[in-house]
């Protein structure tokens, strides 16, 4: 396992300026909002050359000071790009934002590390905080105000002497909020990890006095031990909310384990009605007293994201990024989404309108069950990544940062791009040398795939229309329905609770968890799942019989799928039975173990002309007769396919259904094998061949089919991580959803989620999904209380209505859809018996 602690650092952009004040030294009742970064895309994957090369330590705090960038950390030396001349800079430096040239006029001397930098109360000033005690020989215990142009100490700001280090600061109005590991802010001022200062004079005030107490993990006997207090502060851009994370259990004596939210009122900061127990678990308590590492607010004030270390402990928020809704209230709150690294530390987070940027010691994301390895759903991301704000899944942005070192310890989103600080020298796989600080410009970035969906009234597309077939019956004897993989009809269910109407009573069912092998008699495309269930006839009573109505004079093939799966009859001669067709024995003394072998699926095809029904009887000889599946297929050439595999109808969502119009599909998706589809933002996503595929579609023209495989990246899959087992690379692992696709009967996209139904299952399921990268969430969820989907042949949603196509009848039914939950009952709105419209198809979706 690779969990490393970075020297702590960082920034918080000032959310207000002193110019917003009406009276010097007082916060306004309604603070002016900070400007949002205004991003309309993710930043470029190629870093700018306009940054210097920091030669040692790490860059842990970055501040955009207009024409300059000011960086703090644990470094002591820097070089201009393309120079080998060291420039001494102890823990703090400034450089030109346009050229990257080190500022020769700004060279303050500090005696220890800088952990945070933010704007000062007036133009051309900047606050710095950290471990230091002197600046330019002037005593400044942990916090100072400097002149941006000269690096001189602004002596009018005379802060108290904090008795411990300051981890983070934030300017709100004319107050400087301070968080760290301290118990006093000057001798007469007890403060437990949080304090507020007059931003002009430095005087301690009584605005923020919340006291943080008790170690998270250290209990006096066991666990790692660290100082108690605040690690990071995040202020909402409107200046009304403060989130504090750190090593503490209580805030003002009330349990707020590692995180507390504070309301920033006009005259006092008070603990908000916001609490969660999700950061209570100890996780790797031997190594970490606290495992929260960074927090950032969204530009619209609506949510914040917390990132952590702590090792991979199932069911916890260790080694995760988690989104929390700022407007939520109460106790026992839960995150909106969680992204798991599967064993690696997150260190930093920055948020734009389009992405949640995270950094750390990462190898993968979407890796819920990973333990220092890539498990189902894992997507390789070396150290830095961009997440979809709606669901936390990785977007396509993937420049990487390898080697990873301790990790990317700082992320700062600005109107022009993204700054990343850390302890290593390269962006990409030794691709772009950017020593310890890099800038990804917004210019040249890529727009995130739209998440707009089509609505009704509008168009409904049916792709893979039911084709004429010679298959008359398919039954999965003893099991639930199984999706066809050959374009034909599905295999109908025959369970104990819902037995097939085509056999008599008195037989029983058995199930097996391991797959059988298949011999050469089994037709290609036959689902192997058929052999996981059987219907057998115990001794005594009438023999097991099956009867299928077939028009008189029709010649058919009767196909019996069988396998000996029971270990007690594994040997030849231990299970023998006869099969009679139309009263005559056609399989005499059938011994499956002798004929095919134990745990081997086989098939016997019998040809007969119907006299009005096909009658089968399974007769005892020794042990119990059995059958796994029955298929009846009319002989002769297959019927001609329908003229167009795709058609569109107008539909108002109620009762007005338009006539079908064909849609040309020149690129030739085999829609007959599709496992439904949905349209989002100009792209149709559909299941086929055990995977998701995507095609652009504008309502008239389909683009070329493209396999959706974000779990493998030609650039990164062969790059060795230098962690874990020898030779481990950043290659991901295909999502578990792909194994479900052969049984998917319907799917739609809504609110960052992919909802879907499964063959033979009554519920409605969902996973997170981002159309930008095509990543499907590693975790499957079930919509609580949803039922009635066992007969679904398609599902789609429009506004507050959920629609379901009945695959047995072709009816279209609807129900209310409120907050991602369907109402209890469906009402038929259209169908063959209602208006003559058959809604069945392999893929049914609302589109442009």
Q: Which residue ranges define each predicted feature?
A:
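Well-ordered beta-strand scaffold positions
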Residues: 480, 584, 682-683, 752-753, ...
